[in-house]
């Protein structure tokens, strides 16, 4: 784990509000997707919400593996599940939670275009300033490590897996609470994970 990782932890309601704002931007742009493509795992929640808000019932998935830990990635993203629907001749909106390096988003966009989509646009909730790709629609830019509400336990587990030192674990999980994750939830997950773990 990188030293001095700082976190941003939006709540469910904050993410939903950002997606409401994003819906308006998409509508105002005149883009009307035929299919929404959620990048699993991180983009699934946002894709499902945008499917509802934009009233686009056609929802597909694609899976990319890139992250191996908190603030840690593989050298390159790997497409592990091809798109789950036919997109040939359709307008596709690719949705992910964050454009960090931009490599995953580029990989998926290239894949969807290769599958014959006639137009592809991208949407993320967050974007990092160093991302190689600027999504067509993005709600917020940050340089912090984002912990979404749908990955709280996963994040706590990755912190524990990096440390056998209880003090280091407590310091890192305290930063999660400071960023806005509910303390009782972090403590619950920490207790569950530590009970399974033998350092």
Give the role of each language-model region:
Residues 1-199:
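PRPP-associated nucleotide enzymes
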């Amino acid at each position: 784990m990188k030293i001095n990782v700082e976190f941003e932890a939006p709540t469910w309601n904050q993410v939903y509000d950002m997606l409401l704002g994003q819906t308006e931007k998409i509508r105002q742009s005149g883009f009307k997707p035929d299919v929404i493509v959620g990048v699993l795992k991180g983009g699934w929640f946002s894709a499902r919400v945008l499917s509802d808000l934009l009233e686009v019932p056609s929802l597909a998935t694609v899976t990319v593996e890139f992250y191996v830990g908190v603030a840690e990635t593989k050298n390159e993203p790997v497409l592990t599940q091809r798109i789950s629907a036919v997109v040939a001749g359709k307008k596709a909106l690719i949705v992910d939670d964050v454009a960090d390096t931009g490599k995953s988003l580029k990989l998926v966009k290239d894949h969807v275009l290769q599958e014959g989509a006639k137009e592809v646009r991208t949407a993320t909730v967050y974007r990092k300033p160093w991302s190689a790709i600027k999504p067509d629609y993005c709600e917020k830019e940050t340089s912090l490590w984002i912990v979404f509400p749908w990955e709280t336990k996963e994040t706590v587990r990755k912190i524990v897996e990096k440390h056998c030192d209880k003090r280091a674990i407590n310091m890192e999980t305290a930063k999660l609470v400071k960023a806005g994750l509910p303390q009782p939830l972090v403590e619950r997950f920490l207790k569950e994970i530590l009970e399974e773990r033998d350092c």
